[in-house]
Amino acid sequence: MENFPIINLEGLNGEGRKATMEKIKDACENWGFFELVSHGIPTEFLDTVERLTKEHYRQCLEQRFKELVASKGLEAVKTEVNDMDWESTFYLRHLPKSNISEVPDLEDQYRNVMKEFALKLEKLAEQLLDLLCENLGLEKGYLKKAFYGTNGPTFGTKVSNYPPCPNPELIKGLRAHTDAGGLILLFQDDKVSGLQLLKDGQWIDVPPMRHSIVINLGDQLEVITNGKYRSVEHRVIAQTDGTRMSIASFYNPGSDAVIYPAPTLVEKEAEEKNQVYPKFVFEDYMKLYAGLKFQPKEPRFEAMKAVETNISLVPIATA
């Protein structure tokens, strides 16, 4: 079996650049996922993020989760649960406007650290989008502009903890899905595993590695590349031992951004056979996704194509 792609971003400097870019290209085309090491975010800083996130869970969220489990009788289930996930979560919004100062129960240090964390990940996301542009033969800045909308991209973080589960065979940590948005950057627990992706009909573990950032591609990048890159189904398997930390940051298009395949990536044959992905306003896709997240993505694309309107397309200026 092929090894899960692990990419050292330091390889972009010097003679290793071509090989590193080829690894990124292969990961985007064949996996939809890859793991970054030497990505430029200091390891000491990531240690602080992890420590404060786990402290916050223990102090503010753990008891609430136990009460939720008890109220729904989840510890005693005998049949598979298909309408809930075994996870404790909260959300932080960064762009276009941050809500970190308004989120309750966050210690000041944790609040400030997560603001800094968001800035570092935003910078990394935009660097990666330009690397994808380079591999796709698009102008530098094309993908960032494609995401822009009126007020810039949307960017937020889902902070999750997956506590020990007595019946992991009956309830998932997170049910299988593809991500609706653009580029996802995940800082995950390196001691407790659980994340899996679907490749060639097999569920494959995403290896937990200390201080790495896991990248996966969302549905919008599949549309913009007209299927050259694809979003991939993934899930979280609950574990009987240990609480798994997951901090997933989503660099997505602005709500009013018009998403459509980059013209240079639409081959003539695909156009003639009407094998071109739809164009739509990102917010409209998200409304559809909200009710269909845990279902296959293809019907979502078909539904958007069916209601496709004459949205005015203007060339994406990258200069």
Swiss-Prot record:
Its cofactor is Fe cation. One of its GO terms (molecular function) is L-ascorbic acid binding. Fe cation binds at H177, D179, H234. It comes from the Eukaryota. It catalyses: 1-aminocyclopropane-1-carboxylate + L-ascorbate + O2 = ethene + L-dehydroascorbate + hydrogen cyanide + CO2 + 2 H2O. Pathway: Alkene biosynthesis; ethylene biosynthesis via S-adenosyl-L-methionine; ethylene from S-adenosyl-L-methionine: step 2/2. It is an enzyme of class 1 (oxidoreductase). The keyword Iron applies. It holds the Pfam family 2OG-FeII_Oxy. GO terms for biological process: ethylene biosynthetic process; fruit ripening. Its EC number is 1.14.17.4. Residues 153-253 form the Fe2OG dioxygenase domain. InterPro entries: DIOX_N, IPNS-like_FE2OG_OXY, IPNS-like_sf, Oxoglu/Fe-dep_dioxygenase_dom, Plant_2OG-oxidoreductases. Keywords: Ethylene biosynthesis, Fruit ripening, Iron, Metal-binding, Oxidoreductase, Vitamin C. Signal peptide: none annotated. Disulfide bonds: none annotated. Belongs to the iron/ascorbate-dependent oxidoreductase family. This is 1-aminocyclopropane-1-carboxylate oxidase. It comes from Prunus mume. The gene is ACO1.
